[in-house]
Structure formats: structure tokens, C-alpha cells
Amino acid sequence: MTTTGTGPGGAAGSAGERPAAGKAASDPARNPDAADAEDAAPVIRTRGLTKRYRGGQLAVDSLDLTVPGGTVFGFLGPNGSGKTTTIRMLMGLISPTFGTAEVLGRPMPGDGRTVLPEVGALIEGPALYGFLDGRENLLCYDRADPTADPRTRGARVDAALERVGLSAASRKKAKAYSLGMKQRLGLAAALLRPRRLLVLDEPTNGLDPQGMREIRALVRELAAEGTTVFLSSHLLDEIEQVCTHAAVMARGRLVVQGTVADLAAGSRGRLAVTTPDPGDAARILAEHGLTGLSADGDRLTADAPPADVDLADLNAALVSGGVRVRFFGVERGSLEDAFVALTGEGFDVAG
């Protein structure tokens, strides 16, 4: 569903428990203003936000979420964790059972008519007229926006198509578009006018690797222009590459939120050993109390030892035990490590 005015989907609008402290890492792939985001007014704030469906299913439970302005904010969670339900409440598509949500400082869904023209959204895939071509679909979206100047409509549509790389396919019927092309067209609809907030639910779904890189570059470009981007994705690598901040959901509850750098740093990382003797190495490390041992060829990894364990002593124990050590060290924690530690779930976190 793409929301930009009242479009083909009929939706109105254009469209933690322990916050981590500190600044985002200095990374050219991230918004250079991320370090100042902690002081920015939040563009999204929820307090006790709860959604219980008929039949008693509790989809979102007492969510306290804060999205600072000027950030690229990643929203992560396993299947059924409540991510999409949260987004639908933020956009006014469904009402909460309890609690409050503010978007751009205004209550939702009550102030949707004021808020949604400043928000572009791509939720659960774009709503398109299959019998119209790509350009005609965007013209429909633009006509549905009462604030859009009809005199510049064509120029806006062409600029949006160019920005998402669909100019060459703009006269092709939407029903013939691939999934990735439909995602691009939905994103173009969300970008027909400048937005203060862009909400994207799995924006790279269906894209090939080059298309994914292009969308990531576009997200960074939008952030550099001052747009706050709220991004739900099942690709942890994508979140690490493009997001400055993130929140993790599990079973309808917020587990943690903070900068991506701090969330990754909060993971203990992994001890890595490269050796032609992985069996002996695993036995010796286990004897010294290490857990989470995993071997892949000549590479052995384990949970990082506690701070009071001397790595030099572990290395010496391996050598004295006849293990031929080619590499030994602790690799820094990743967002994936932090996610698994926080949720107990594996890498596939779509939903």
C-alpha cells in the first residue's frame, strides 16, 4: 500500500525498554548529522501503544517508541513481532486499542489530515492500477493530492520516475511490472512532493542487488536533504549499512532502541580461531569454559569470553595443546549478533 493523498489503495494521507546512549559511529554510509539526532525533536513518539485484535490476539503491547528527527531509523523484528501493525497505527490505517501515537508532533489518527500530506509511505507493497502504465499511476496519485499544483504535475511525475530509475519503463503497463519495479513505482509515488517523513516497509523487496544499492543510495540522499526515514526491513545488513538508529521488536514488545553503532557495540562479539586443528581447538576452549562453539572448515568461533578471562592465556593454552593457531582474536559484534542475543531469533526477521 502506498499512501500519498487518497490514491488507488483508498488510504488517506501522503502517507524501549533500555535506550542506548552515545553517538552513532562516524560512517560515510550514514547520515553525517546522526550524532546530533539525540537532541532533535522526535518525528514519531508512541506511549503505551497497544493493539489487541478481535479474538484476543495482542499484536502490539505497550510500545514506547521515539524516532528522532533527521535519522534513518531501522525497525526490526521477527515474524509476528508487531512491526507492520505498528506502522499501520502510525499512519492512521488502524486505530490503537490503548495508548497514544504522535507523528510530526500531532496525535494520530486524529490529526491525519494535517500530518499525512507531510508523510510519504510505502506499506505492504504499492497499490497500483494494473491497466495503467507507470506514469499514469503516478498522475492518479498526484491528482488525489489536493495540495498538488496541477500546472507542474507532469514535471513532478517525471522527476519522481527519474529518481527511482523508472523513466525508461514509465509507459509500460503496471500489471507487467516485476515486483522490484512495482516497489520502485510505489517509492516514486511517495516522493511526488518533498516529505518531512518517509515510512518504508521492506522497500528493497523484489529488487536485485544493484537495485538494492540504488535504493539505499536514495535513502541516504533523502536523509541528507533533511527527510527522516523510518525503514522496516528483514535485511540486517541493509539496516547496518543505511540506518543511523534502530529499534528491535519481539512478541509485540519493544526490546531495545538506540543508535545502530551502540546496539552493535552492545553485543559481546565472537572469539575467532583459524587453525587446521579445529577439533582439538574446540575441545580446549570448551575445557576453559567457552560456549557457543561452531566450526566451519578451519575456522572456529565461540561466544566471546568474559572480561576477566585473559585472551593471551587462552591462546597459550591452544598452542601448548598442540593446536596450530593461524589467527586468534575477538571480532566485534554486529547488529545480527545483537538481534539474536536480544530476541533469541535467527537471521530471517521478516514480518
Annotate the PLM regions.
Residues 215-305:
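ABC transporter nucleotide-binding domain
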